[in-house]
Design a protein with these regions (language model features):
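Conserved non-transmembrane functional hotspots
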Residues: 1-193
Length: 193
């Protein structure tokens, strides 16, 4: 019983809360982008036009951006679409900043508490690795997007060449599902005790 309490209170519960919070901030950012430019951004869940076989996000939503190069709609991936929205005067930079802040907390929690994963939940450890890799790329993108400090300007230093990002660095959606399942399993066990 004590081990389940520890797993829930130190890993699964906090992770679920952090992921849920990050997801809510992400959705508010989606709404802000839609209100800024509805011909470029849309949430298919709200339009009721989701096609069969489309992989929705863990909360059942599907946010898209119109890709002008491909002349078609595609799934919006924060890590891939960063430069087209961050620092572009769309009023969403604060949402991105907050998601990165929450990501720091998630990353630290994973690094400190991954040993509390339930033994039969090994797939979550793989998802943790994927998340940590994703977050390192996101963090680097965020750092490079910040204006140069006075010290950097005075020294003439630059933040380096733009980071090349691939789809593999996108947020691993499976992690939210696995954390939610684990949290629910532990809550059920604790309720019976």
């Amino acid at each position: 019983f004590d081990w389940h309490v520890k797993q829930f209170t130190e890993l699964y519960g906090p992770l679920r809360t952090l992921f849920d919070g990050s997801n809510e901030v992400y959705r508010r950012m989606n709404e802000a982008l839609i209100s800024q430019n509805p011909s470029r951004y849309r949430d298919l869940t709200l339009t009721g036009k989701i096609e069969a076989g489309v992989e929705v996000d863990p909360d059942g939503r599907y946010f898209e951006v119109f890709d002008e190069q491909q002349n078609s709609w595609r799934k919006f991936r924060m890590i891939m679409d960063w430069s087209s929205v961050y620092g572009q005067g769309l009023g969403v930079d604060g949402y991105f900043d907050r998601i990165v802040d929450i990501g720091r907390s998630i990353s630290k929690l994973i690094q400190d508490k991954a040993g509390l994963v339930m033994p039969h939940h090994g797939e979550l450890l793989t998802a943790f690795g994927n998340y940590l890799a994703h977050f390192e790329v996101l963090k680097e993108l965020h750092t490079r997007a910040q204006p140069a400090t006075e010290a950097e300007k005075a020294a003439g230093t630059t933040k380096g060449a733009p980071l090349k990002v691939r789809e593999a660095a996108a947020f691993p959606n499976s992690i939210q599902k696995l954390v939610r399942e684990g949290a629910n399993e532990l809550l059920a066990k604790l309720a019976k005790a």
